[in-house]
């Protein structure tokens, strides 16, 4: 019988992610791993976590389902859309570079470190797989559905009932607030 594994809110903690992955069995081609967002921020290895996810997607392309969370959306808005942010993702940014590289970037543009680091991520060849992954995932739907389950980072519009797919705002899928728990819907 196929198994579904789900992991959420890794937040840049690679060791903990690897520990959780050690309990996931993808040797059975029918098993699935659903990653439910917030892979970055807080921990010191956000870039390494995403790199591991990209590797898993390549190795198990039909078994890995990857959904974005609000932290990836915020990072996309900052990096790709160049929207201003209040946090500038310090731990996530540090995970892309060595201390020497960060020092060089700071010295190259001391008046606007945020722009300099954004440009370095966007223009450095070693980050192309990450950029492509982020752009592709940003276009993907924010939920995964089985016959009996809905996987989503934050929530759905519970009042919409069977019309939740059509009536849930994209914001609610990844950033639902306040947190609520509702009935279990079986369609």
Locations of the language-model features?
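Feature recognizes metal-dependent phosphohydrolase scaffolds
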Residues: 1-187
């Amino acid at each position: 019988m196929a198994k579904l594994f789900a992991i959420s809110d890794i937040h840049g903690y690679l060791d903990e992610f690897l520990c959780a992955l050690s309990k996931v069995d993808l040797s059975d081609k029918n098993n699935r791993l659903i990653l439910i967002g917030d892979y970055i921020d807080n921990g010191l290895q956000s870039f390494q976590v995403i790199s591991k996810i990209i590797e898993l997607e390549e190795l198990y392309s039909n078994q890995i389902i990857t959904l974005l969370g609000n932290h990836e959306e915020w990072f996309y808005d900052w990096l790709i859309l160049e929207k201003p942010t209040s946090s500038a993702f310090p731990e996530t940014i540090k995970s892309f570079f060595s201390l020497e590289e960060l020092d060089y970037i700071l010295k190259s543009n001391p008046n606007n470190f945020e722009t300099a680091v954004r440009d370095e991520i966007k223009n450095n060849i070693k980050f192309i797989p990450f950029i492509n992954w982020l752009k592709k995932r940003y276009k993907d739907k924010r939920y995964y559905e089985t016959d009996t389950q809905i996987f989503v980072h934050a929530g759905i519009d519970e009042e919409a009932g069977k019309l939740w797919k059509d009536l849930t705002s994209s914001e609610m899928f990844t950033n639902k607030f306040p947190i609520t728990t509702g009935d279990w819907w079986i369609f």
